[in-house]
Regions:
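Predominantly soluble domains enriched in secretory-pathway, periplasmic, or organellar proteins
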Residues: 1-273
């Protein structure tokens, strides 16, 4: 995913640790009050607050189209925000309990994991219309996209698998067993590897995107819940929920090379593409 960390100190709701950066604006979801806070990435000041659907749980953006996509778990919709005007320009009905958001900027496709209906909704970014609904396994919680090979990787939390979707045909091409309760997933375009955070087994599974097989399992700290990949230095940052520690994995050796404290609730790490 090629992300780097940025810490901001602003008066927003930090109870839902998810954010996305676009055009030096950072979009942070506020699950408790059904809004998205927009923060200036240079000054760290709050720009505006945008009302979205009920219980927003995740956010991602397409830098090619300047669109931000927010999954609203409480009303089974996706809110589409124009990052140029910071206004909602579309509300898209999807499956039950939408959670993860994956984007292929080359194809202008948005992939939504529906944890409550065990499906993935495929949205055409040019029309804001769902063009396909793909059945996957139990409780798909998160998703990431390998845009170079047009494949989509879905973490199925209660089946302990990753579904691999062919983006051209919208069909399942492989199902890969991973650890206990995979909760987040990230694509490393530098080495063609997929990294899966397994919350209950306290590990990260590494999948070879060429063979769709697990080639490594890395022990980390307790309850790994978020994956962040920095392609500039080939490092994988794994946030461990239980002890607020980030495990840093060297993508070349698959070894944990550092453990870093996250901090308290007054700070928040934002992914910045």
């Amino acid at each position: 995913m090629g992300k780097k960390a940025k810490v901001v100190h602003v008066a927003v709701d930090f109870s839902s640790p998810k954010g996305k950066s676009s055009n030096n604006q950072i979009y942070m979801i506020n699950e408790d009050n059904n809004t998205v806070s927009v923060v200036d990435g240079v000054t760290d000041e709050l720009i505006t607050t945008i009302s979205v659907g009920r219980q927003p749980v995740n956010v991602n953006g397409n830098s090619s189209t300047n669109r931000i996509y927010v999954t609203n778990k409480g009303d089974d919709t996706v809110s589409v925000i124009d990052a140029g005007t910071n206004t909602v320009i579309g509300i898209i009905p999807v499956g039950g309990q939408p959670s993860g958001v994956g984007i292929n900027p080359y194809m202008d496709r948005v992939y939504i994991t529906n944890a409550g209906s065990d499906t993935v909704s495929v949205i055409d970014g040019s029309t804001n219309i769902v063009v396909a609904t793909i059945p996957v396994e139990t409780h798909p919680i998160n998703v990431d996209v390998h845009p170079y090979i047009n494949r989509i990787y879905v973490a199925n939390k209660f089946k302990n698998t990753v579904s691999v979707i062919d983006g051209l045909t919208n069909t399942i091409m492989a199902t890969v067993p991973v650890g206990d309760q995979p909760t987040d997933i990230g694509t490393n375009l530098s080495n063609n590897r997929i990294y899966v955070a397994n919350k209950n087994s306290h590990t990260v599974s590494i999948i070879d995107a060429g063979t769709n097989s697990v080639i490594g399992i890395v022990p980390v700290m307790e309850q790994p819940s978020m994956i962040d990949i920095n392609k500039s230095n080939n490092q994988i940052h794994v946030t461990n929920e239980e002890n607020s520690i980030v495990s840093v994995i060297d993508g070349a050796t698959n070894i944990v090379i550092a453990t870093l404290p996250v901090g308290d609730q007054s700070t928040y790490t934002i992914t910045d593409t």
